[in-house]
Regions:
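N-terminal, Lys/Arg- and Ser/Thr-rich interaction peptides
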Residues: 1-43
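Positively charged, aromatic-enriched nucleic acid-contacting surfaces
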Residues: 46-134
């Protein structure tokens, strides 16, 4: 049975990083998965707004900041730091996201790169890693 992810947190008290990672590493509920075509294949992914729901639920008090913005070879590259408060202190992970500066897809370059960076940083805490086991 899938656990329902709500806006409510699992606990008001700080949790151990081990418990947070354990919960974020659970398979993402099917209703939170999206699909897109990439490299001739259909891939499943979690949207940035669903990633936020999981972080709010399992890692209350989390935050992120954009640490760096670069433009390299026509690509906008953002580096973010995702910070999670826990019993051990504040644990952070950094990740990058990129997007073509001139693209014709949904959204704009900076929003798309930021979304990718946030999801990648959350994956370093376990969120969505089960999607790569297929």
């Amino acid at each position: 049975m899938e656990e329902k992810i709500t806006d409510e947190t699992v606990s008001e008290e700080l949790r151990s990083i081990r418990d947070i990672v354990k919960d974020l590493s659970k398979p993402v509920a099917k209703r939170h998965l999206r699909t897109r075509k990439q490299g001739g294949q259909q891939i499943e992914y979690i949207s940035w707004y669903d990633a936020i729901k999981y972080l709010d639920h399992y890692a209350p008090g989390w935050c992120y900041e954009i640490r760096r913005v670069d433009s390299i070879g026509g690509k906008l590259i953002l580096t973010i730091r995702l910070s999670v408060p826990c019993q051990e202190g504040i644990v952070f992970r950094e990740a990058t996201g990129q997007e073509d500066e001139m693209h014709d897809k949904f959204g704009d370059s900076s929003s798309n790169a930021e979304s990718m960076a946030l999801r990648r940083a959350a994956a370093k805490f376990g969120l969505g890693l089960s999607l790569y086991e297929k």
